[in-house]
């Protein structure tokens, strides 16, 4: 088995997140149009935006994969051919269908696009993976429930031309590869059509039928009981083993998460993957960057066996808040920034950016674009000037630590 450097595939829920993923080192991004995708609550890309997004990515040498992974009903299936032709004409590199009918339509109506079988298909063995290849798939996104040993077994038994993609980072679903009806039953929002309300994150208690109104927690905790709560996956410390398993693509979950998340997690995995592949010991500072985004407690998922559940707390950990984003910066460090959250002259903050090792900075007095002094910019999205200690790339972040809650 040839050892291949995996593609780093990163989330792009909208144009801002796309720019961040591209700038911070993605080899490819995955996104959705306004139809047939599994993230209804992200902005996604309109027919006018999609060609612009593809051009932005392709100009940077980044591929674009588009999800077509809902389970379509009859009326939607009838609308699929025109949509697939639109994606093909726009220059999408690969489509990610979950439904067999959609997969076959993609081969007919989007002949220039590769077909990557979605994780919603729960591909969990070599026979299934090979069958999809025989039908025309160039890649399968394996079920998240597989161990490293099982993935290696698939790699050894399928055609070497078939690419294998696995998730390496992000939220995990308590159901099998996302096949869940809790949201449908409890809220009327279809989890298999991009509308999951995440009822697995709700607080639950037990009630005995002869004692109505008396609620008994499954686990004693003043915050509630989280009987279906899953940790987030983080495999950044195990990328060498993922490479050894013959995985062709490492996927970061999170199209519905923030642009900051897309940037920081992409950058962290880019640096560590490059170091691992080159035989270098990864710099710890990049591994620690995944702790600087909002997340639940981390685990290695199913890669090393059954992960169990995290039953203490369902809340996200948020240790860092974004103050501003750098729009441009000259060689002397004179920068134009866009405000995200309040901060003031004299604050100690961190600066992190594309290919930029994080560093601390004490904020000097600032000014607006007309040169009027600012001690504390206050208006969200306002543009202002500040003197940084050195030149930093556009799309760098100014951030500061915040007090933890929920740990």
Task: List each language-model region with its residue ranges.
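Surface-exposed amphipathic alpha-helical tracts and adjacent flexible/coil segments at the periphery
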Residues: 1-23, 28-31, 35, 54, ...
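Glycine-rich, positively charged N-terminal anion/phosphate-binding segment
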Residues: 39-58
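Short beta-strand elements of ligand-binding domains
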Residues: 66-67, 97, 117-119
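Gly/Gly-Pro- and Ser/Thr-rich, intrinsically disordered tail segments characteristic of DNA damage-repair
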Residues: 78, 113-124
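Alpha-helix capping/helix-boundary segments
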Residues: 101-102
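Conserved phosphotransfer cores of two-component systems
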Residues: 110
């Amino acid at each position: 088995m040839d050892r291949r450097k995996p593609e780093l595939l990163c989330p792009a829920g909208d144009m801002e997140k796309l720019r961040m993923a591209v700038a911070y080192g993605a080899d490819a991004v995955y996104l959705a149009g306004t139809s047939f995708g599994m993230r209804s609550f992200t902005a996604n890309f309109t027919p006018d935006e999609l060609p612009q997004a593809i051009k932005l990515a392709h100009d940077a040498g980044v591929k674009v994969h588009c999800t077509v992974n809902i389970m379509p009903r009859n009326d939607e299936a009838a609308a699929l051919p025109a949509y697939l032709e639109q994606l093909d004409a726009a220059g999408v590199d690969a489509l990610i269908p979950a439904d067999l009918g959609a997969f076959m339509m993609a081969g007919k109506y989007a002949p220039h696009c590769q077909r990557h079988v979605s994780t919603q298909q729960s591909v969990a063995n070599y026979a299934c993976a090979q069958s999809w290849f025989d039908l025309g798939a160039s890649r399968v996104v394996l079920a998240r429930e597989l161990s490293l040993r099982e993935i290696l077994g698939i790699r050894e038994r399928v055609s070497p031309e078939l690419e294998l993609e696995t998730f390496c980072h992000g939220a995990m679903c308590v159901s099998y590869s996302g096949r869940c009806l809790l949201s449908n039953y409890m809220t009327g929002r279809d989890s298999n059509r991009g509308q999951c309300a995440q009822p697995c994150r709700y607080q639950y208690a037990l009630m005995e039928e002869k004692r109505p109104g008396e609620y008994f927690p499954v686990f004693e905790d003043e915050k509630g009981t989280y009987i279906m709560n899953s940790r987030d996956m983080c495999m950044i410390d195990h990328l060498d083993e993922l490479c050894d398993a013959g995985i062709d693509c490492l996927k970061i979950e999170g199209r519905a998460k923030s642009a900051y998340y897309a940037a920081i997690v992409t950058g962290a995995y880019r640096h560590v993957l490059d170091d691992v592949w080159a035989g270098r010991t990864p710099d710890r500072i990049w591994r620690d960057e995944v702790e600087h985004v909002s997340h639940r407690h981390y685990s290695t998922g199913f890669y090393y066996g059954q992960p169990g559940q995290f039953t203490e707390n369902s809340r996200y950990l948020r240790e860092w808040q974004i103050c501003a984003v750098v729009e441009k910066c000259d060689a002397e460090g004179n920068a134009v920034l866009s405000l995200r959250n309040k901060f003031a002259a004299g604050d100690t903050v961190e600066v992190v950016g594309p290919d930029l090792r994080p560093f601390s900075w004490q904020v000097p007095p600032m000014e607006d674009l007309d040169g009027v002094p600012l001690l504390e910019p206050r208006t969200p999205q306002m543009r202002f000037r500040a003197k940084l200690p050195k030149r930093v790339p556009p799309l760098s972040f100014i951030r500061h630590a915040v007090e933890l809650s929920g740990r």
